[in-house]
């Protein structure tokens, strides 16, 4: 696939940094001059703009999908997430709460990342059916046309504006209730309960949109999710064997996505390079920097993501999910926050609200990265791949390929214990406020 190419004028920041074009030697140049603006001031402006846009959407009566969130640093330096993700899809309110790790399995709320991001989906049944929990039939409800002030934007610009800036934070989302499922009486009660609805709604697909938490649980190339406890067999596409969602939980950095996409014309690199092969232009993979330094690059560059680089990374992630020759992909769970476009009144609502949080919370990001790296090792060790695909992975020795690219799950040590602690006790890393009363008074 071609690298992500922005549409000129699609964003107020489209002129920041170079445009990504096909054949560019280094696609990861990051410009940082505009980070000199005070973080606190910009954060306040961005959050205020977000809420103004949400209010404008609510005033137009457009409440087909809603999302509320806030990311705040805690006093102890951890990543505080005062969040509950509220959706009203087809008249059913679904509150996706950050859930602790246990045996509850993956979320029932399955979201098709590729279709929502890159296909011209109109406001209708396709998105509602994907976002509804299993067992809850989408009910025809709110108007399926965007507000009048948003109809003029062409779909191409809408797709390119849908950039993600995402943090390496492993979490689970479940539907309303600790059990993670909605029965019909409960859904009906929530649909008619005003207390369950926020007055700050934002259209999940519109131009003034906030890219809400994307949950991709067991996504394969055909775009279908694997529900908790289900086994995926070779019934659709070229899947073989079965998939256990917990074993396939991974958050993949742009660096890892670029490295795993490297193929050297479909065979192992003849020189067995530990880094991606630069022998010819056709062999050169997409990557953020000329030198691939793995997790060091990710942790350093996390605080310097421009909207352009964010869009490129998300493009790589989408390719990783949906364009890998029909093979079952590792599950990806991510918190993603995109920019919202100009709202109905024409105000520019700002950039990403999350991209600079690593700048002030380096310890939290590092701790999460360790946990993510452990989960990536677990995922690859248990993922279903053919022998040919394992051999074609570059950037590691034969023994590492045999064990699954990286194998820190085989080596006991403090990082391993930290990762296991993150899985078992996520509240020590992410503060979760489950009190509904406090969720309604953020500003």
UniProtKB/Swiss-Prot annotation:
Domain of life of the source = Bacteria
Q: Does the keyword Membrane apply?
A: no
Report residue spans for region: Disordered: 263-292
Q: Which UniProt keywords apply?
A: Cell wall, Cell wall biogenesis/degradation, Secreted
The UniProt entry's GO biological process terms, in alphabetical order, are: cell wall organization
Where in or outside the cell is it found?
Answer: Secreted, Cell wall
Question: What segments bear the compositional bias annotation Basic residues?
Answer: 263-286
Biological role = Cell wall protein that resembles the beta subunit of human chorionic gonadotropin. Stimulates growth and change in morphology.
Record's protein name: Chorionicgonadotropic hormone-like protein
Q: Whose protein is this, by species? A: Stenotrophomonas maltophilia
Gene that encodes the chain: xcg
């Amino acid at each position: 696939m071609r690298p992500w190419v922005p549409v000129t004028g699609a964003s107020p920041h489209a002129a920041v940094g170079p445009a990504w074009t096909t054949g560019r030697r280094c696609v990861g140049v990051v410009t940082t001059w505009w980070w000199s603006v005070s973080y606190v001031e910009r954060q306040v402006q961005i959050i205020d703009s977000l809420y103004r846009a949400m209010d404008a959407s609510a005033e137009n009566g457009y409440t087909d999908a809603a999302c509320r969130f806030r990311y705040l640093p805690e006093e102890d330096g951890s990543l505080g997430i005062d969040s509950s993700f509220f959706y009203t899809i087809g008249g059913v309110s679904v509150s996706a709460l950050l859930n602790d790790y246990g045996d509850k399995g993956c979320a029932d709320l399955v979201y098709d990342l590729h279709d929502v991001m890159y296909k011209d989906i109109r406001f209708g049944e396709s998105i509602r059916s994907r976002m509804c929990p299993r067992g809850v039939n989408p009910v025809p409800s709110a108007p399926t046309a965007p507000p009048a002030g948003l109809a003029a934007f062409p779909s191409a610009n809408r797709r390119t504006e849908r950039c993600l800036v995402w943090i390496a934070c492993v979490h689970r989302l479940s539907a309303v209730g600790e059990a993670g499922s909605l029965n019909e009486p409960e859904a009906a009660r929530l649909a008619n309960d005003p207390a369950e609805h926020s007055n700050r709604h934002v259209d999940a697909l519109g131009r003034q949109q906030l890219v809400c938490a994307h949950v991709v649980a067991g996504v394969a190339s055909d775009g279908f999710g694997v529900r908790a406890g289900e086994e995926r067999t070779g019934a659709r596409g070229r899947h073989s064997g079965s998939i256990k969602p917990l074993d396939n939980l991974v958050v993949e950095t742009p660096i890892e996505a670029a490295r795993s996409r490297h193929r050297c014309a479909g065979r192992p690199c003849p020189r067995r390079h530990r880094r991606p092969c630069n022998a010819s232009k056709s062999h050169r993979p997409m990557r953020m920097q000329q030198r691939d330094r793995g997790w060091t690059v990710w942790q350093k560059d996390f605080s310097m993501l421009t909207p352009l680089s964010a869009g490129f990374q998300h493009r790589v992630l989408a390719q990783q999910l949906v364009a890998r020759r029909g093979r079952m992909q590792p599950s990806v769970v991510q918190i993603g926050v995109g920019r919202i476009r100009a709202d109905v009144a024409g105000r520019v609502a700002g950039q990403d609200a999350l991209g600079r949080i690593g700048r002030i919370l380096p310890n939290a990001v590092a701790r999460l990265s360790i946990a993510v790296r452990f989960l990536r090792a677990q995922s690859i060790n248990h993922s279903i791949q053919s022998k040919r695909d394992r051999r074609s992975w570059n950037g590691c020795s034969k023994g590492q390929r045999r064990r699954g690219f990286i194998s820190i799950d085989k080596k006991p040590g403090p990082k391993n214990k930290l990762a296991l602690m993150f899985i078992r006790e996520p509240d020590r890393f992410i503060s979760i406020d489950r009190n509904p009363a406090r969720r309604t008074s953020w500003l």
